Amino acid sequence: GVGEKPRVRLDEDEVEQLRQCRGRFQQLTGKGYFDWCMLDANPRMGGHFLWSYNDYNRGAEEETMFCGVVDVNRYPKFSYYMMQSMRPKEVSQPGLYQGPMVFVASFNSSGDYITSTTDIPVFSNCDEVRLYRNGRLIGKQTREDQKKEYGAIIEKGGSPLYLFNAGGYEQGELKAEGVVNGKVVVTHSVRTPEKPHHVRIVVPSHQVRPVADGSDMIPVYFIVCDANGTRINDSKAEITIDVSGE
């Protein structure tokens, strides 16, 4: 991998997650340190694809390659949503994503992190993004505002990185609004994690009906949550699982 932080584990903190995203933005804008890392900035290139989508076990070494936008179990990192913001807001894929999107790339977890204080990242393919903390507007930015920094990406249909400065830290909710033609069309919120309360089990189907004959394998996620249902990203809790049946 190339760039500031090409590899990041899912359990690393929110700043490290952002560093992987920022490295990919630098490659698109021509600030990568290899010639081919000028994908959108190079007028001869009309598109790009990502290697690798997921983290994977390396055949030559024991260490896992953590360069994916999802982990080995296909659970999304922040960079997954960064890549999702590059698609046109008019494009939908039933069961996977719907048109306009916005994502707050922060856990709002600590005043020690720039991603919860002075550089709160938001990914969106909308015309304008507004960010609120506990109901108060932090700021709003448009695609047009970002053309100086991300002009090459925007000109080819992609989306910029929106960074908001809250001036400090406050526990609670960060809420982003995606605006198209002056109307809020999509929102995303994150809350400061509190004490562990319960385990939520998620079985993503991806529109696949699994058959218990050994031919299908799907991930099952056990997520440690607080009383509000907020995922506790840095939980070190041990979970015992008993499975029965054939």
Predicted feature residues:
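Extracellular Ig-like/FN3 beta-sandwich strand-entry sites
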Residues: 169-173, 215-217, 236
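Short, solvent-exposed loop/linker segments at the N-terminal edge
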Residues: 109-116, 207-218
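Low-complexity, acidic Ser/Thr/Pro/Gly-rich terminal tails and inter-domain linkers that flank the onset
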Residues: 193-213
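Extended substrate-binding grooves/exosites of carbohydrate-active enzymes
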Residues: 1-169, 173-183
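Short, well-ordered beta-strand segments
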Residues: 136-141, 236-246
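Beta-strand-rich structural segments
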Residues: 120-124, 215-232
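Edge beta-strands of extracellular beta-sandwich domains
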Residues: 182-194
